[in-house]
């Protein structure tokens, strides 16, 4: 279920008590507008909903840094923008640092700083 999928990182975080899991999962799901999907199977969700589940997994432990590897890959333009809006809002509202790996220039353009790499080497920096 979506609930169990979001719970995965909590099971590995020994600092968060099991009694807090349900509340944290519901809070993360609510912030991403997927609270009504918690009892569904992930396979039944749309691509955009699956991306929001992945983001919920990333934020449920409330860490200061979110690492997102191609968070909008395979999404259409509308869902790409929705996912980016959600990620940017989380950073702005909660003071999180977001590190994004992307090949999509429209995603990169929304970032404060950009580091371009080729063959494992930094080739360009912007916004510093």
Predicted regions and their residues:
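Short coil-to-helix segment of the ABC ATPase nucleotide-binding domain corresponding to the Q-loop/switch region
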Residues: 1-8
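Hydrophobic anchor residue at the start of the ABC signature
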Residues: 55, 83
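A short, proline-enriched helix->beta-strand linker immediately N-terminal to the Walker B motif
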Residues: 60-64
């Amino acid at each position: 279920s979506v609930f169990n999928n979001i719970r995965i990182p909590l099971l590995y975080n020994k600092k968060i008590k099991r009694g807090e899991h349900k509340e944290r999962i519901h809070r993360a799901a609510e912030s991403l507008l997927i609270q009504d999907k918690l009892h569904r199977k992930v396979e039944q969700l749309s691509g955009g909903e699956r991306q929001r589940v992945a983001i919920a997994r990333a934020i449920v432990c409330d860490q200061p840094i979110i690492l997102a590897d191609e968070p909008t890959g395979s999404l259409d333009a509308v869902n790409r923008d929705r996912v980016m809006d959600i990620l940017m809002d989380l950073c702005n509202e909660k003071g999180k640092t977001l590190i994004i790996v992307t090949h999509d220039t429209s995603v990169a353009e929304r970032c404060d700083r950009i580091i371009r790499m080729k063959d494992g080497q930094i080739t360009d920096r912007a916004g510093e």
